[in-house]
């Protein structure tokens, strides 16, 4: 097989953006080696891949092949609770398809890094759902309904359509409490801040019990921040360090 020429000193090759399942954009950043470990990366809510390319590039410098996704604001701003479960199912199916393709090309290791909404999507992509994802970073976490309810614009859209927080929590119970199946040997870290008003640190612990019962090693780390956005940015900046912490063959890395 002929190797493509390197297009950047940061990543080996950047494929043009393509629409994934359900129309969400997917962009791929190849490492120099085709057998490099792959990180699936989902952007924060309302954030484009281009906006967080700097974080993807930092992972590329460490030799990772990155497959990045973004989701439209419609997932919350349309005021339709059915969009979120559909988006999760579509992204999960696309990830499985990409894993099958990459495995056929010689890749043997897959992990993830998700921020904000992206973190929650990955919460529904581990265990029996996508068993190849053995390690990953949840950059913020907690209850999705309460987090969305704290977004003024999204809350108004749902209230206008007759939704209350209690009804929304019931509608999203299936994705808030997924059946993980087997997580034996998996390693995950949740990143958050006490000052994050959308997804605060103390909202994470109630959702970790089922992961641990399924066999996963799960830790929670606090980053210095003053709100949700700065929490996300702090986690993205430290992405290489957090990834190194959960990769079994690598162990903790120096602070960056």
Identify the residue ranges that each predicted region occupies.
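Primarily recognizes the serine-hydrolase "nucleophile elbow" in alpha/beta-hydrolase
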Residues: 100-153
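C-terminal catalytic histidine-bearing segment of alpha/beta-hydrolase fold enzymes
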Residues: 212-256
